[in-house]
Amino acid sequence: MKFAVLVFPGSNCDRDMFNAAIKSGVEAEYVDYRETSLSGFDGVLIPGGFSFGDYLRSGAMASVAPVISEVKRLAAEGKPVLGVCNGFQILTEIGLLPGALLHNDSHLFISRNEELEIVNNQTAFTNLYEQGEKVIYPVAHGEGHYYCTDEIYQKLKANNQIILKYVNNPNGSYDDIAGIVNEKGNVCGMMPHPERALETLLGTDSGVKLFEAMVKSWREQHV
């Protein structure tokens, strides 16, 4: 398995994503936002940061980068796509995930560890966790308030697309939502950073299982 780790001007978690993939026992390669082909890749990791300086709004300019058409193609083919923080914002901007990310209710940038609950462990991203398991991931965002219409929210609930919730909501997200998947279950977006939660020495290794779950799910289908 080989992941494409996208790199935009202003990305600052691409190395963490790369490290998470390698730590999971698979290959990874940095891919510039101007690239027009993702042939040869089995999945996409869209890192956090401030793509294009967050001008216009977070993820807006990245959403029209040349590589995005290939991200959409891989997603349509059922390949795993994970967007974290700014990556989540990009996924909502390009329509692969519903809803939007707004400014935190506090209007402050939040950077700390947060306790989260796995509320759906039947996905390619969470199947190594226990249902209801509590995990610790770092958060680092100013626009992490997940918002959607009531209609979209009811659809998310009906399809079991909400996979991760905050235990103590730090940003005002609708129903404490921290992470969701698309209807097919192969595209995931979350504001917390599992790629920064790989070592107990650094405070938490709760994120290891997420990347291992992605690899496990892919291998079950392809090996």
Curated annotation (Swiss-Prot):
Q: Does the keyword Hydrolase apply?
A: yes
Annotated metabolic or biological route of this protein: Purine metabolism; IMP biosynthesis via de novo pathway; 5-amino-1-(5-phospho-D-ribosyl)imidazole from N(2)-formyl-N(1)-(5-phospho-D-ribosyl)glycinamide: step 1/2
Tell me which Gene3D superfamilies the record gives.
3.40.50.880
**Predominant location category:** cytoplasm
Mind telling me which InterPro entries this protein's record contains?
Answer: Class_I_gatase-like (IPR029062), PRibForGlyAmidine_synth_PurQ (IPR010075)
Q: Where is this gene product found?
A: Cytoplasm
What's the Enzyme Commission number for this chain? 6.3.5.3, 3.5.1.2
* GO terms, molecular function: ATP binding; glutaminase activity; phosphoribosylformylglycinamidine synthase activity
Record has ATP-binding as a keyword = yes
State the UniProt keywords alphabetically: ATP-binding, Cytoplasm, Glutamine amidotransferase, Hydrolase, Ligase, Nucleotide-binding, Purine biosynthesis
Q: Name one GO biological process term.
A: 'de novo' IMP biosynthetic process
Known catalytic reactions: N(2)-formyl-N(1)-(5-phospho-beta-D-ribosyl)glycinamide + L-glutamine + ATP + H2O = 2-formamido-N(1)-(5-O-phospho-beta-D-ribosyl)acetamidine + L-glutamate + ADP + phosphate + H(+); L-glutamine + H2O = L-glutamate + NH4(+)
SUPFAM superfamilies reported in the protein's UniProt record: Class I glutamine amidotransferase-like
- Domain Glutamine amidotransferase type-1, residue spans: 3-223
PANTHER family on file:
PHOSPHORIBOSYLFORMYLGLYCINAMIDINE SYNTHASE SUBUNIT PURQ
Provide the assembly information: Part of the FGAM synthase complex composed of 1 PurL, 1 PurQ and 2 PurS subunits.
Q: Per its database record, what is this protein's job?
A: Part of the phosphoribosylformylglycinamidine synthase complex involved in the purines biosynthetic pathway. Catalyzes the ATP-dependent conversion of formylglycinamide ribonucleotide (FGAR) and glutamine to yield formylglycinamidine ribonucleotide (FGAM) and glutamate. The FGAM synthase complex is composed of three subunits. PurQ produces an ammonia molecule by converting glutamine to glutamate. PurL transfers the ammonia molecule to FGAR to form FGAM in an ATP-dependent manner.
User: What's the protein name?
Assistant: Phosphoribosylformylglycinamidine synthase subunit PurQ
Question: In which organism is this protein found?
Answer: Staphylococcus aureus (strain MRSA252)
